[in-house]
């Protein structure tokens, strides 16, 4: 079971933009190999930073509106939102250390 909640076009504003804590958004698709590689890393981050950040996933096939709104061209793309604004992003399957360092800047 994934530690990250699934977010849709209709719940993105409520779950991400209106969040009181920073949010890591994993834009992914079921057919994407690198997305499957980074998924366990995203889950580890969700557990490691529980209570400090919220971690959610957006399936770009099922939710094209949010993906196009944020200019998602390749997946996986991991974006960090804080106070309703995109503050950082990482593209591609990255190691946990890279993702942690990126997140730490926004806590």
Swiss-Prot record:
<comment type="function">
    <text>Participates in various redox reactions through the reversible oxidation of its active center dithiol to a disulfide and catalyzes dithiol-disulfide exchange reactions.</text>
</comment>
<dbReference type="InterPro" id="IPR036249">
    <property type="entry name" value="Thioredoxin-like_sf"/>
</dbReference>
<dbReference type="InterPro" id="IPR005746">
    <property type="entry name" value="Thioredoxin"/>
</dbReference>
<protein>
    <recommendedName>
        <fullName>Thioredoxin 1</fullName>
    </recommendedName>
</protein>
<keyword id="KW-1015">Disulfide bond</keyword>
<dbReference type="Pfam" id="PF00085">
    <property type="entry name" value="Thioredoxin"/>
</dbReference>
<dbReference type="GO" id="GO:0005737">
    <property type="term" value="C:cytoplasm"/>
</dbReference>
<feature type="domain" description="Thioredoxin">
    <location>
        <begin position="2"/>
        <end position="107"/>
    </location>
</feature>
<keyword id="KW-0676">Redox-active center</keyword>
<comment type="similarity">
    <text>Belongs to the thioredoxin family.</text>
</comment>
<dbReference type="InterPro" id="IPR013766">
    <property type="entry name" value="Thioredoxin_domain"/>
</dbReference>
<keyword id="KW-0813">Transport</keyword>
<dbReference type="GO" id="GO:0015035">
    <property type="term" value="F:protein-disulfide reductase activity"/>
</dbReference>
<dbReference type="InterPro" id="IPR017937">
    <property type="entry name" value="Thioredoxin_CS"/>
</dbReference>
<feature type="disulfide bond" description="Redox-active">
    <location>
        <begin position="32"/>
        <end position="35"/>
    </location>
</feature>
<keyword id="KW-0249">Electron transport</keyword>
């Amino acid at each position: 079971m994934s530690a990250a909640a699934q977010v849709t076009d209709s719940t993105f504003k409520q779950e991400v933009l209106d969040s009181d804590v920073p949010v890591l958004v994993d834009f992914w698709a079921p057919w994407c190999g690198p997305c499957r590689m980074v998924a366990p890393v995203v889950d580890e981050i969700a557990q490691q930073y529980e209570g400090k950040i919220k971690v959610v996933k957006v399936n770009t096939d099922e939710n094209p509106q949010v993906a196009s709104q944020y200019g998602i061209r390749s997946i996986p793309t991991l974006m960090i939102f804080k106070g309703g604004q995109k503050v950082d992003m990482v593209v591609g399957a990255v190691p946990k250390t890279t993702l942690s360092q990126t997140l730490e800047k926004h806590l």
